[in-house]
Each structure stands twice: as structure tokens, then as C-alpha cells.
Amino acid sequence: MGQKTHPYGFRLGITKDWKSHWYAERSDYSSLLHEDWAIRNYIKKNYYQAGISLIEIERKAANRVDITIHTARPGMLIGRGGSEIENIRKNLVKLTNKSVFVNVQEVKNPELDAQLVAENIATQIEKRINYKRAMKQAINRALRAGAKGVKVMCSGRLNGAEIARSEWFREGRIPLQTLTADIDYGFAEAFTISGVIGVKVWIYKGDVPELHKEPIQELPEKAVPKKIEDEDLYEKDEVNYDVDA
């Protein structure tokens, strides 16, 4: 049975970039990785309603952490006069014991962000809205926003069924095996009375223009040995015979 590879990891280093930018020695790698997880978990858990799509972490020095939060509602993170963003920074300083700088960037088009679409569908399911209606509405909004293809899948005890199953809807193209395809992927969970329902969203936005590549210089053609005939092995001496009359 075929399985779907993660669209982000499949294109990592080709059309997608890393979410964490830092380098560490082997002895420090695990602690910094756990620190990244703790930072993302704190922000996502305490500000879930802010519509956070992506959290980028960069370490330019040993005691400095730069965090960029991509959100659909920057006002909820910044607060009145920047009070909320300062509160986030202070809590992260206590969590990491390092200097923390927080930057907030607004997501211009939330309908084309797969993570935000998945979280929106999960929230509607938790509010007892029919999952089919939530999925179809999300697909229509994404297509109107300019998406070339959308696929949404819900898995779990849908509508409280005794047996878990998966249902999905798709509109347009989703070329999962094309490395130059700009496919955004998001995953969210809806916690209901009957259990957890997983929501996956794929959004195809078009092809990414190929990166600039230097023209490959053509190698000189390989010399092909010429076939030597037997007649060429021995040169024939030309002899002139003078015949006296």
C-alpha cells in the first residue's frame, strides 16, 4: 500500500527552506533541538487563536535567539502598545536563559496557507459543524483565492461513528511527485467527544521558477580511433623506371 511522503521534507533544500537556522556541535545538538520544540510549543499553546502558521528560529550567537512568528492576526501577538509581544519575550527569556528577539510577520492570504486552513477546519469540527461542509467551504475559499489545486482529508471517528475512517475531497491538481511544484501542507487535530480527528490539507499554488543554473560546458567529444586498413600499414615506395630506347 502506497504512503504519502511529507511534501515539506520531500522538497527541503530544493524549493523549501529549513524552519530552524543554526549549527551546533554534536554535544549541544539535542539540547538546542529540545529548546526549539519548547519555544514552538509555548507560543502555539498559549496563542493558538492568533492563527500562527510558522515559527522560524535562528541562532546567530550562543546566547541569542531570533524568533519570527508568521500569523494571520498580528494584533493578538503584539497587543496594545506592544505589551503582549514584550510579555512573550520575557517568558521565552525565562524558558531559554538567553537573549530573545521576537519579530511578527502577517500572513497576507490565510486562505492559501495550508496550516491555517487545517486549523480552521479542526476548529469548526470541534464546534460540531459537519466535517463535509467545513472541508468543501475551505476548498472553495482557497480556489477563489488563487489556488490551482486543493486536497483536504479528515481521519477518525467522523460524526461519532464506531469505526474510524478517512474521507477526502480534492479540486484541481496536486502534483505530489513534482519537485518544482509549490505545495503547502498543513496538519491539525480536532478534539471531540468521540475522539481525535486529524485534518490534513494540501494546497498547490503553481510551479516554482527553476533556480538560476550556470550553463554546463560541453565536454570535448571523445576521440574515436580511426580504423587503419592493412594498406596503410606499409607505405608503397614509388619507383620510376627510366627505359632507354
From Swiss-Prot:
GO biological process, one term: translation
Keyword terms, alphabetized: Ribonucleoprotein, Ribosomal protein, RNA-binding, rRNA-binding
UniProt GO molecular function: mRNA binding; rRNA binding; structural constituent of ribosome
GO cellular component terms listed in the entry, alphabetical order: cytosolic small ribosomal subunit
Disulfide bonds: none
Keyword Transport appears in the UniProt entry: no
Domain KH type-2: residue ranges: 39-108
Keyword flag Ribosomal protein: yes
Pfam families given in the database record: KH_2, Ribosomal_S3_C
Lineage top rank: taxon: Bacteria
Family in the record: Belongs to the universal ribosomal protein uS3 family.
Function, in words: Binds the lower part of the 30S subunit head. Binds mRNA in the 70S ribosome, positioning it for translation.
Alphabetical list of PANTHER family matching this protein: 30S/40S RIBOSOMAL PROTEIN S3, SMALL RIBOSOMAL SUBUNIT PROTEIN US3C
Subunit structure as annotated in this protein's UniProt entry: Part of the 30S ribosomal subunit. Forms a tight complex with proteins S10 and S14.
Listed NCBIfam families: rpsC_bact (TIGR01009)
Name of protein: Small ribosomal subunit protein uS3
